[in-house]
UniProtKB/Swiss-Prot annotation:
The gene is secA. It is an enzyme of class 7 (translocase). HAMAP family: SecA (MF_01382). Zn(2+) binds at residues 946, 948, 957-958. NCBIfam families: PRK12904.1, secA. This is Protein translocase subunit SecA. Its main location: membrane. May bind 1 zinc ion per subunit. GO terms for biological process: intracellular protein transmembrane transport; protein import; protein targeting; protein transport by the Sec complex. One of its GO terms (molecular function) is ATP binding. It is found in: Cell inner membrane; Cytoplasm.
């Protein structure tokens, strides 16, 4: 109570922070008359003037006021929009590296122009991050008009660009793109062989739109680049055939944690069933050599118990397509990881696509922490403010609205059963539709949106198909005539193609729109209709001229009239029902259930009441909803029973809302803990990733890596001597035979080690010096024979390729370690500390293996004389087919797409001309492999992709023919 009194007197910390920006807002406003008087050329010249001030020692903060004033005037001239004072405050928050929380319709896109322009003046690049390609392209085109007017360049990073186009976009002053594209470009850059091929030029400043969606909802989802592995589709089908025979007592299912495991009885049943099916040929299921079978059983079990068709995924065109739980969109190209997607494909009897092996990965948490300065924008961040502060060191500032929010958020209506809840929703839709009030109904899944659609059809409503050319005509005719159409639209993954039209017209009088979660849609619902959409749809055939202008004026007038109707569509007071006040018109949001996160509910509510418009929102719940059933209090059901509610009757009370909010807070806290835990483990890999990537980039930047190669050779000899000649041991105790064998194997040297050991007074240091001298002499002769230029090229490529190969193997090993490390807790040992310790040992092993393998390969390189190319390839050896994935370590969800290597993009792979050393790829030769001529392949590793181009491993293709 004292806190609330103090808050009223002194204001909140947020109020005080916002107040602190007001003096600079006043300074910007004071500059406005002076800047308004400038010509376009003079306004554009201010960019060069501000750059000069930076070059002369001023900081970005020093020039913030004139820079913001310049952008404001440019935006006004380019598309007639002037930044409000609160938008200037939002821009300052972003410039300082904070999160600006701005309500729907408050112009976040326009706000970003202020800090983007200011920071772009440094010439180090500014990245604006959006959630999809459409928004990246739209915002770059729209806001790019302002930047180009002021003399800055703008680029866009979207799917399908080749490396040259990406490099050009990153070289611009300002770059728009999606979070996935930025992350994958970073990973791809760290798989290339020349600095000249790198697309990105550093991580200076990023502004993340919908920051809560990207840095919170997707924080656990690593970006993964992977390559194909062996086809095991028959095994997936065979294991899947066993799942329908499992009874419920054979497994433990935890919906809250989304986990499932076989009971002891279930293990016995599966073992016996697999023996009968010929899948378990020897030993027990959990024997080490059967670990792959265990993995397949677990994934098949998850597919059948944790994942539901039309809720978590749909089947379309012989594919299992994931549904995003936050937006309800189809995630074309996304795939679940670790064989789960293949298990779902087996379950649904569709074509099973091959699995992939991780080649490089990074989480969004660690990618975005690469930036020197990071900022974000969203309409809903306050509920996650603690997480932003702890993980990203970002403060959330609630920016005041330009106009007060007029939306009325009503208390939830809670029913006993789902059926009663839906009946209540249909009744409310009937009432609102009769008043011509536009309604947006939010559902949690495709399944639920289609269930509600079926109920509406039974109630006499029909589905509005926006693929029909006359659909919009009918919508507007009904609005003009004041007719009740009893028609509705469905916005979910199945109707993705119609999304823009459905959202644009959701504010027309009498519109009924059923939508899965609206998070990240990026399109405002405007009351009365969307002018731009109508012009595009209705006037696309008209050229510019008086006729088109007249038609546009008519559409504007009709939208204004429709807006007036929508504003007047509120529900009058009903004293008999205990409601003394009128309820407002505007867009009516009806939520069919609460989401696990309050933030998602707030995003749905925020679709109504934009820019001071009136609006209304209400959630309809039942005790059978997932949130209430899994996380809600058992006492709530008892309480409703005691109240003696009749069939179809609901309870409405603020206490119910508080109880639900507590359930949501429990879930949010659990999810936060999971994300923090993921980050702790990923930080271990991230530290190693930074070392490897920095070292790799250092190698790429050197003209010659001879010094590194020499140091590696010397280190290998030190290790060999230490391994076979114990300290202070007599010569008779030395492992001379082992030393000679290893010297031959690694250094390719045939030296009389036994004779040296018999010499009087010989010591380990003398042995080391002789081996080093012999190795250096042999390598110098090889270099002279091959030529210095060729040797330098081969050294660099061997070093980079070997590092890549070992790093990929290391990633797989760390992943396996992480999956089993949790069991250490049963031995009273901290799994995280155990993981750190073992990961460190594994990394040391990687460094040792790198020295030995590079030394061994370079000691055997021979040149095979063929027709020489015009010049040495800049790109190094060709890379195998690769895919980009977006993996969730908890749910297993993946985004997967071609990673930019292949047609249209060299991806750093370079031409087919390359080198090969024994033990790596071929017989130690610089040669060109012809896929049709096996004589040009040299020696191929059994696990390498077959040079014929089949995509299979060599041992399963041409290698099997030679075996």
């Amino acid at each position: 109570m004292l806190g609330s009194i103090a808050k009223k007197i002194f204001g909140s910390s947020n109020d005080r922070r916002v107040k602190g920006y007001r003096p600079r807002v006043a300074q910007i406003n004071a500059l406005e008359p002076e800047i308004q008087a400038l010509s376009d050329e003079a306004l554009r010249a201010r960019t060069d003037m501000l750059k000069a001030e930076l070059a002369n020692g001023k900081s970005l903060d020093d020039i913030l006021v004139p820079a913001f004033a310049t952008v404001r005037e440019a935006a006004k001239r380019v598309f007639g929009q002037r930044h409000f004072d609160v938008q200037l405050i939002g821009g300052m928050v972003l410039h300082e590296g904070g999160i600006a929380e701005m309500k729907t319709g408050e112009g976040k896109t326009l706000v970003a122009t202020l800090p983007v322009y200011l920071n772009a003046l440094e010439g180090k690049g500014v990245h604006v991050v959006t959630v999809n390609d459409y928004l990246a392209s739209r915002d770059a085109e729209w806001m790019g008009q302002v930047y180009r007017f002021l003399g800055l360049s703008v680029g866009t990073i979207v799917h399908g660009l080749d490396d040259a186009q990406r490099k050009e976009a990153y070289a611009c002053d300002i770059t728009y793109g999606t979070n996935n594209e930025y992350g994958f470009d970073y990973l791809r850059d760290n798989m290339k062989y020349e600095l000249s091929q790198l697309a990105q030029r550093g991580h200076n400043f990023a502004i993340v739109d919908e920051v809560d969606s990207i840095l919170i909802d997707e924080a656990r989802t690593p970006l993964i680049i992977s390559g194909p592995v062996d086809d095991r589709s028959e095994l997936y089908v065979a294991v899947d055939a066993l799942m329908p025979r499992l009874r419920k007592e054979f497994y433990d299912l935890d919906e809250k944690q989304r986990t499932v495991s076989l009971t002891e009885e279930g293990n016995e049943f599966i073992e016996e069933a697999m023996r009968e099916a010929g899948l378990l040929k020897e030993g027990d299921l959990y024997d080490a050599h059967n670990v792959t079978l265990v993995h397949h059983v677990n994934q098949a079990l998850r597919a059948h118990t944790l994942f539901t068709r039309d809720k978590d995924y749909i089947v379309k065109n012989d594919e299992v397509v994931i549904i995003d739980e936050f937006t309800g969109r189809m995630m074309q190209g996304r795939r679940y990881s670790e064989g789960l997607h293949q298990a779902l494909e087996a379950k649904e009897r569709v074509t099973i696509q091959p699995e992939n092996q991780t080649l490089a990965s990074i989480t969004f948490q660690n990618y975005f922490r690469l930036y020197k300065k990071l900022a974000g924008m969203t309409g809903t961040a306050s509920t996650e403010a603690d997480e932003f502060a702890e993980i990203y060191k970002l403060d959330v500032v609630d920016i005041p609205t330009n106009k007060e929010v007029e939306r009325v958020d009503e208390d939830d209506e809670v029913y006993r059963t789902v059926g009663e809840k839906y009946e209540g929703i249909i009744a409310e839709i009937d009432k609102a539709h009769a008043r011509h009030q536009p309604i947006l109904v939010g559902t949690g899944s495709i399944e639920k949106s289609e269930h509600l659609a079926e109920m509406l059809k039974k109630a006499g409503y029909s589905l509005l198909d926006y693929s029909d050319p006359n659909a919009l005509t009918d919508v507007y005719a009904a609005a003009r005539e004041g007719r009740v159409t009893k028609r509705f639209a469905v916005l979910n993954a199945r109707f993705h193609e119609q999304e823009a039209y459905i959202v644009a017209e959701a504010g027309v009088p009498g519109a009924i729109t059923i939508a899965t979660n609206m998070a990240g849609r990026g399109t405002d619902i405007k009351l009365g209709g969307n002018l731009e959409m109508r012009i595009e749809k209705e006037l696309g055939h008209l050229a510019d001229g008086p006729e088109r202008d007249a038609a546009i004026a008519a559409i504007k007038a009709e939208i204004a009239e429709n807006r007036t109707k929508v504003l007047a569509s509120g529900e009058p007071a009903d004293p008999a029902a205990g409601r003394k006040k009128d309820l407002p018109g505007g867009l009516y949001i009806i939520g069919t259930e609460r989401h696990e996160s309050r933030r998602i509910d707030n995003q749905l509510r925020g679709r109504s009441g934009r820019q001071g418009d009136p609006g209304r929102s209400k959630f309809y719940l039942s005790l059978q909803d997932d949130l209430m059933r899994i996380f809600g209090s058992d006492r709530m059901d008892g309480m409703l029973q005691k109240l003696g509610l009749e069939q179809g009757e609901a309870i409405i009370h603020p206490w119910i809302n508080k109880a639900i909010e507590k359930a949501q807070q429990k879930v949010e806290a659990r999810n936060f803990d999971m994300r923090k835990n993921v980050l702790k483990y990923d930080n271990v890999m991230n530290d190693q990733r930074k070392v490897v990537f920095e070292q790799r980039r250092d190698f790429m930047g050197q003209d010659s890596v001879r010094e590194t190669v020499d140091e590696m050779r010397e280190g290998v000899i030190d290790d060999l001597v230490a391994r076979h000649i114990p300290e202070n041991a007599y010569a008779e105790q030395w492992d001379v035979a082992g030393l000679r064998e290893q010297v031959k194997e690694i250094l390719n040297l045939d030296v009389p080690v036994e004779d040296w050991a018999k010499e009087e007074g010989i010591a380990d240091e003398e042995m080391r010096e002789r081996l080093l001298k012999a190795a250096e002499t042999a390598y110098a002769e090889r270099t002279e024979k091959n030529g210095a230029e060729v040797t330098a090229y081969i050294e660099k490529q061997v070093l980079l390729q070997t590092l890549d190969h070992l790093w990929r193997e290391h990633l797989v090993t760390l992943d396996h370690l992480r999956q089993v490390i949790g069991w250490r807790g049963f031995a009273q040992r901290d799994p995280l500390n155990e993981y750190k310790s073992e990961a460190f040992d594994l990394f040391n092993g990687l460094v040792t293996a790198l020295r030995e393998q590079v030394t061994a390969q370079l000691s055997r390189v021979e040149i095979m004389l063929q027709e020489p190319p015009a010049e040495f390839p800049a790109g190094g050896p060709a890379l195998p087919p690769m895919f980009a994935q977006h993996l969730d370590p908890v749910t297993g969800e993946n985004e997967m797409d071609y990673a930019g290597f292949g047609s249209g993009s060299d991806g750093g792979g370079g031409p087919a001309y390359g080198f090969a050393a024994q033990g790596l790829a071929a017989d130690g030769a610089v040669l060109e492999r012809d896929p049709t001529d096996a004589n040009t392949w040299g020696r191929v590793g059994r696990n390498e992709p077959c040079p014929c181009g089949s995509g299979k491993k060599y041992k399963h293709c041409h290698g099997s023919l030679q075996a």
